[in-house]
């Protein structure tokens, strides 16, 4: 057993990997590759220690359970393969519908009977009366989504009005997927297509290796991810020109400049690694929201119907949680009443001596005078 522990390799962790990946899958979030390897190494060490602590008979049973797990993983692999084939099949069936949507949104074709309705007396009140297609379709759809609305700044909106279409596709080498954003000619950047690509360690589980975005070719003075600060020189200064400083600012277009894992991660401390992982998880969340929600249900987000559906689902979840909480509270109240009755029977009756003083948390002196924790702004 000791020799196996010294010669441990990540390839020996097949039994541990599905469990770690499943935990990430439940939250549908990505993790850092190197952090995952560290965890797997740790799991492997724990696995060896656990087996060494078992009696031979129990260890033999556990080894047999691991063989069963291996059989399960083989079946699971077939499931992933068949699921990918099924998704590819239906993706092809969706494509003609997405093409029709593109043509209508961008005014390439007109809906049958679209111009047959009699002109309304109040037609002049509608700003889009003479517009082609559906103006601001993708901008409105994305702004309606809670995750994406936090990313889209007011200064981004004029540029996103030129967004004509969003598509996604799987990639095989390396495994992952990409998002393509198609833009009409605009005064902000030269690119007609902005692409975001996600490389996955495992296509079937959301374990992110890295993300790559298109470098945006901004026109001079139009970079929405930067702001230029001008500071007047001090009085009496020889340099009369204002001092300019460029700062990075919040923008949806930062999505195309994703956080990167350094090539040499040995010098990264735990706090920096946690911060980087949080950034990558958030970036992945944005990408999957666009892929899984916005693209397939764009018109429902445009009209707001998708929000109502999500709110309804959240209400159902909250009601179930409230019911569970109510049951727990009732059980606790019953237990408290029983304990109070027993205490009343066992204690002699005394006159009230005023409200009891509660001990300070953590046993600290003068707990009442200590301020509550606050987050630094």
Curated annotation (Swiss-Prot):
One of its GO terms (molecular function) is histone binding. A motif (Nuclear export signal) lies at residues 54-69. One of its GO terms (biological process) is nucleosome assembly. Residues 308-343 have a biased composition (Acidic residues). Residues 306-377 are annotated as: Disordered. Keywords: Chaperone, Coiled coil, Cytoplasm, Lipoprotein, Methylation, Nucleus, Prenylation. It is found in: Nucleus; Cytoplasm. Highly expressed in tissues exhibiting active cell-division activities, such as root and shoot meristems and young flowers. The keyword Phosphoprotein does not apply. It comes from the Eukaryota. Residues 355-377 have a biased composition (Low complexity). GO terms for cellular component: cytoplasm; nucleus. Residues 33-87 form a coiled coil. A lipid is attached at residue 374 (S-farnesyl cysteine). Residues 375-377 form a propeptide. Gene3D superfamilies: 1.20.5.1500, Nucleosome assembly protein. A motif (Nuclear localization signal) lies at residues 230-235, 347-351. The modification Cysteine methyl ester is found at residue 374. May modulate chromatin structure by regulation of nucleosome assembly/disassembly. The acidic domain is probably involved in the interaction with histones. Binds preferentially histone H1 in vitro. This is Nucleosome assembly protein 1;1. It comes from Oryza sativa subsp. indica.
């Amino acid at each position: 057993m000791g020799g196996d522990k010294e010669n441990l390799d990540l390839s020996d962790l097949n039994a541990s990997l599905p469990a770690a990946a499943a935990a990430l899958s439940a939250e549908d979030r990505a993790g850092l590759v190197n952090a995952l390897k560290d965890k797997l190494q740790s799991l492997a060490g724990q696995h060896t220690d656990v087996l060494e602590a078992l009696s031979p008979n129990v260890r033999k049973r556990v080894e047999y359970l691991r063989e069963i797990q291996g059989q399960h993983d083989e079946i699971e692999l077939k499931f992933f393969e068949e699921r990918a084939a099924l998704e590819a099949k239906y993706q092809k069936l969706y494509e003609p519908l997405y093409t029709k949507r593109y043509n209508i949104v961008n005014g390439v074709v007109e809906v049958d009977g679209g111009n047959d309705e009699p002109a309304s007396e109040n037609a002049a009140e509608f700003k889009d009366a003479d517009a082609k297609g559906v103006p601001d379709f993708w901008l409105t759809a994305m702004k309606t989504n809670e995750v994406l609305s936090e990313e889209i700044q007011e200064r981004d909106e004029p540029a996103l009005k030129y967004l004509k279409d969003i598509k996604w596709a799987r990639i095989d080498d390396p495994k992952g997927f990409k998002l393509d954003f198609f833009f009409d000619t605009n005064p902000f950047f030269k690119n007609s297509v902005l692409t975001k690509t996600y490389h996955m360690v495992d296509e079937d589980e959301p374990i992110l290796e890295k993300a790559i975005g298109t470098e945006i070719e901004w026109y001079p003075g139009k970079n929405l991810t930067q702001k230029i600060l001008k500071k007047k020189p001090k009085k009496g200064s020889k340099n009369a020109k204002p001092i300019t400083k460029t700062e990075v600012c919040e923008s949806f277009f930062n999505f195309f400049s994703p956080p990167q894992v350094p090539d040499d991660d040995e010098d990264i401390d735990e706090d920096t690694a946690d911060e980087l992982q949080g950034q990558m998880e958030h970036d992945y969340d944005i990408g999957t929201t666009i892929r899984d929600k916005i693209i397939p249900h764009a018109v429902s987000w445009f009209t707001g119907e998708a929000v109502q559906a999500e709110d309804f689902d959240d209400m159902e979840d909250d009601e179930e949680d409230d019911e569970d909480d109510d049951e727990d509270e009732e059980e606790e109240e019953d237990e408290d009443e029983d304990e109070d009755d027993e205490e009343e029977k066992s204690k002699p009756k005394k006159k009230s001596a005023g409200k009891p003083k509660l001990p300070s948390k953590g046993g600290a002196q003068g707990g009442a005078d200590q301020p509550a924790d606050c987050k630094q702004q």
